[in-house]
């Protein structure tokens, strides 16, 4: 019995020695894995007057021109605000002003997926939200009401910015 007890003790020591042989050795390496996400949204817009908008008589809903908008990066709508824009009866309009800043006529944006907004979120201004994730949009601007216009150059100021839920 003594022999077998010694054999068991030797086997136990071998097993313990094997267990101590497994483990970490050497130094520990440290890696900081930084990542940069370069998601950038850029917005630009251009204006082109409609060739048929010559006056002096203009009809209600006559096309004044087109806002061509490029909106890169992830977004689900584009907001368009107008300097001096207002909402009346649920319809947002923007003034086209003369050289002295006096309103001469009003324009509006309307169409599928376009909602009039009392506050677009752009500097608290009224305008429109175009529900679209497209990169390029061509948004028509039409007259609000009919009028007879004097000769001159009239300007509306639009602010365009992307929106993401």
From Swiss-Prot:
Location(s), subcellular: Fimbrium
Top-level taxonomic group:
Bacteria
The protein's matches in Pfam families, at most eight in alphabetical order, are given as: SEF14_adhesin (PF06443)
| Role | Structural subunit of the sef14 fimbriae.
Signal peptide limits: 1-21
UniProt KW keywords: Fimbrium, Signal
Q: This chain belongs to which protein, by name? A: Fimbrial protein
- Is Chaperone among the key words of this record? no
* Record has Signal as a keyword: yes
| Disulphide bridges | none
Q: Which GO terms describe its cellular component?
A: pilus
In which organism is this protein found? Salmonella enteritidis
